[in-house]
Amino acid sequence: MEVDYLTSLPRRIHLIVDEGAKAGASRPALTDERGIVWSYRRLIDTIEAVAGDLARLGIRPGDRVMVVGENSIGAIVLMYAASRLDAWAVMTSARLGPHELDAIESDCKPRRVFYTHGISAEADAAACRRGAEAESFTGIGAIKVGKLEASAVPEEVYEDPARQVAVLIYTTGTTGRPKGVMLSHRNLA
């Protein structure tokens, strides 16, 4: 019997977490930066709530959502919450310099920029430089949020997971400007 493995994969990356919960929602899904163990149920509930928070802040399907931070529960939840909305997560390191962050923001034209300032002095400095203000997010606490970019044009949304972009990652180096790499849900699932 032949199995088409591609069609058996989750259609969106946030559904990977849902798949993990099928073996037991109370099982550990991950351990955060404070050493707190998150169950699949808690993670799923938080992702759903933060997706609602993003929508309340004006994030639409096809928008780019830039996240400036360190590896943290906030960054993980923001990425999966963007997936729930069919928005593109643009994950960037807070350790990049101001010119690199500005170049990435200028290139990807995000609807909003989110800064995981609570665990990163660098993310907080970047947020302060851009005039971002703290907002409370369900389950992950305060995240600094940049202004709504009303002129941001959303990308087309595709049902096909091979065509729908999940994450836009920028490469950086010592020469040249950062370059964006679009990874689809199929690339990541």
Regions found by a protein language model. Name each.
Residues 10, 25-26, 151-170, 177:
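Conserved pre-ATP/AMP-binding loop-to-beta segment of ANL
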Residues 28, 63, 87, 163-164:
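Surface-exposed loop/turn positions
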Residues 56-57, 84-159:
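Structural core segment of the AMP-binding/adenylate-forming
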Residues 37-41, 166-189:
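Conserved AMP-binding A3 loop
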Residues 1-38, 42-57, 61:
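N-lobe entry segment of adenylate-forming
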Residues 36, 51-99:
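Conserved AMP-binding/adenylate-forming
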